[in-house]
Design a protein with these regions (language model features):
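Hydrophobic, well-ordered secondary-structure elements that form the walls
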Residues: 260, 301, 321, 329, ...
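Short glycine-enriched, charge-decorated loop/helix-capping segments at active-site entrances
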Residues: 47-48, 168-169, 208-211, 272-277, ...
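Proteins enriched for Cys/Gly/acidic motifs involved in redox and nucleic-acid/cofactor modification
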Residues: 1-204, 219, 243, 258, ...
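Terminal RNA-binding accessory module
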Residues: 344-435
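Contiguous mid-protein beta-loop-alpha structural module that forms a pocket-lining wall or clamp
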Residues: 309, 325-326
Length: 435
């Protein structure tokens, strides 16, 4: 039987999809990416923005149209939050929540076409107190060189704009022992790089007994003497301190790259969002990192058009990014999420103004990326070869630059490369054979 799995959204979603694919393959199912040839199509949905909702619905409708005979399954965060709305789409057979997602391996033999969607959703995920375990994936199943490892799920922050705690539940963590076991499994699979991911990494370990911090977990991983690169996914500025930054100095395996969920450069907007840090805290982190490590990659998330965001508030964000040595930005247009505090706020920013501000920030993002690439020209970096693209080998450096080479290389090898010139979305390089 052929199963196609499609993923929308974050690295946690991707990790869970990869895990399911590996479990299915071990049970004898074939994992494909062709809708027309699939017997079962699973969409792991996202609901972080209005656009993610739309993309989830569009993909489900596309599957139903292209292959009406296939069993269509919607799971993930949008399925968790909007199961009643999804149930109105004719052709969806099953709507499965985040808690129930892990049970898909047991449900598969019993799935069949339905006249009406069957809904399997825990109605109140905020009551979940244990981590739903998804085992790490096999490299021959996902055919990727970079492995994700979900070590944490859920969030207790309840920021005013964010629906994620309602879709993912409260913060829960994988035990340090399980984390270490999974890391060795992935290393033995042949992965050369591991990305720690979670809904709120900084909350890792607070729910465990005894509690353990994310920093303490990283130190424990460091002591294992692993032979693979470690990369971190998004971090909250409030959880990055001196000891955390110091770890990058003492651990060569830890990639010099952080993605910081800033969201706004306006103190007023940060307070309305319920974010637990100041602009000065963000500045302190960025300047300290760049002082210690001049080629450190720093990415930021920005939400544009939060209710009440004035032109002055926006310019505070724009000028902060312009002045700080930020490497790149991920820019999101604000959209109301049902049930959140900000959805009830007045002073909504008109869509045309949001679009104008997004356009300005995206141009600034292009400038920031170009400047970061320029600073790295002539350097030698360690590139993990990930794929072949139009005759080029493509991979990422330790500081997250997309690097292209014409020379023949093997996928899943780390190669020393000299960066030469701008190229596509990254930099053109040549293998460095000197000392």
């Amino acid at each position: 039987m052929n199963i196609a799995i499609f993923t929308i959204g974050c690295k946690v979603n991707q990790y869970e999809s990869d895990s399911l694919a590996s479990l299915f393959k071990k049970k004898g199912y074939s994992i494909i990416d062709n809708i027309e040839k699939a017997h079962i199509c699973i969409v792991n949905t996202c609901t972080v923005t209005h656009r993610a909702d739309y993309d989830s619905r569009r993909l489900l409708r596309q599957i139903i149209k292209k292959n009406p005979q296939a069993i269509c399954v919607a799971t993930g965060c949008y399925a968790q939050i909007a199961y009643k709305k999804l149930a109105q789409i004719k052709g969806i057979d099953y709507i499965i929540g985040n808690k129930e997602k892990a049970e898909l391996i047991k449900l598969l033999p019993y799935l069949k076409k339905q006249s009406f969607p069957q809904i399997l959703v825990e109605k109140n995920p905020t009551t979940l107190d244990t981590l739903v375990c998804f085992p790490p994936s096999d490299r021959d199943t996902i055919k990727r060189t970079r492995a994700y490892l979900k070590i944490q799920d859920g969030c207790d922050a309840f920021c005013s704009y964010c629906i994620v705690p309602y879709a993912r539940g409260r913060a829960r963590s994988l035990s340090p022992e399980e984390v270490i076991k999974h890391i060795y499994y992935l290393q033995n699979q042949g992965f050369k790089e591991l990305v720690f991911c979670g809904i709120h990494l900084g909350e890792y370990g607070k729910d465990l007994f005894p509690p353990i911090s994310f920093l303490s977990l990283l130190k424990l991983v460091k002591d294992q003497g692993l032979d693979l690169r470690i990369r971190l996914s998004s971090m909250n500025p409030a959880e990055i301190n001196y000891q955390f930054i110091e770890l990058f100095e003492n651990w060569p395996n830890l990639c010099p790259h952080l993605h910081i969920s800033l969201q706004s450069g306006s103190e007023n907007i940060l307070q309305k969002m319920g974010r637990p840090y100041t602009v000065d805290k963000f500045k302190e982190i960025v300047l300290d990192l760049k002082y210690r490590f001049p080629y450190f990659a720093i990415g930021v998330d920005i939400i544009v058009g939060f209710p009440g965001e004035t032109e002055r508030n926006f310019l505070q964000t724009y000028n902060l990014i312009k002045e700080m040595p930020v490497s790149y930005c991920h820019i999101f247009s604000y959209s109301d999420r049902p049930g959140t505090k900000s959805a009830k706020m007045k002073e909504k920013v008109p869509l045309e103004i949001i679009k104008k501000r997004v356009k300005a920030l995206r141009q600034l993002d292009k400038n920031k990326r170009a400047q970061f690439f320029k600073e790295n020209m002539g350097r030698t970096v360690q590139v993990l070869i990930e794929q072949k693209v139009d005759g080029f080998s493509k991979g990422h450096s330790e500081n997250y630059i997309s690097v292209y080479m014409e020379e023949k290389t093997e996928i899943n090898q780390i190669i020393t490369v000299k960066l030469i010139d701008y190229f596509h979305d990254g930099v053109y390089g040549k293998i460095h054979r000197g000392k």
